[in-house]
């Protein structure tokens, strides 16, 4: 199925690209999320008319993400306190929601979906966590897990 992308999508393309995707991906994700429209003649003409507006919107979103990334870069290590055993092993774990809540409490609003962690944190110590604020903008935050 041919679609026109209205946003930059990782491993697929950028704004205005006409790409072929599987029908289910288009119908169930791209079109309902407003990230693409079907590539019909009418939609192509409409897109060409709105291209400058969409590019400005995309640039504004990226600028806002870069501003948030600068604020994240200024943060000192974010401290998360959790119950732990004598050897530093946590009772439970710290996931993306806990990290996002701690960063938001430190003064920069971050959503759970923006936090990128390979695994949950299960031990005390210092970790580097990547926060993906935009398709092109990433920031690294120091997270320090301490025992209560």
UniProtKB/Swiss-Prot annotation:
Query: From its record, what is one biological process in GO terms?
Result: translation
UniProt keyword annotations, A-Z: Ribonucleoprotein, Ribosomal protein, RNA-binding, rRNA-binding
Similarity section: Belongs to the bacterial ribosomal protein bL9 family.
Q: Which gene encodes it?
A: rplI
Q: Which GO terms describe its cellular component?
A: ribonucleoprotein complex; ribosome
The answer to whether UniProt assigns keyword RNA-binding to this entry is: yes
Query: Listed GO molecular functions?
Result: rRNA binding; structural constituent of ribosome
Q: What is this protein called?
A: Large ribosomal subunit protein bL9
One Pfam family hit: Ribosomal_L9_N
> What this chain does, per the record?
Binds to the 23S rRNA.
């Amino acid at each position: 199925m041919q679609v026109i992308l209205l946003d930059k999508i990782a491993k697929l393309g950028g704004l205005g690209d006409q790409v072929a995707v599987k029908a289910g991906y288009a119908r169930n994700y791209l079109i309902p999320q407003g990230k693409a429209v079907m590539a019909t003649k009418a939609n192509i003409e409409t897109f060409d008319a709105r291209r400058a507006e969409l590019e400005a919107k995309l640039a504004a979103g990226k600028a806002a993400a870069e501003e948030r990334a600068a604020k994240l870069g200024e943060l000192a290590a974010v401290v998360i306190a959790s119950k732990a055993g004598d050897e530093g092993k946590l009772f439970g774990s710290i996931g993306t929601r806990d990290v996002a809540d701690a960063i938001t409490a430190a003064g920069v609003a971050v959503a759970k979906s923006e936090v990128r962690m390979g695994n949950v944190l299960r031990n005390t110590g210092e970790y580097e966590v990547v926060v993906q604020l935009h398709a092109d903008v990433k920031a690294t935050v120091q997270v320090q897990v301490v025992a209560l």
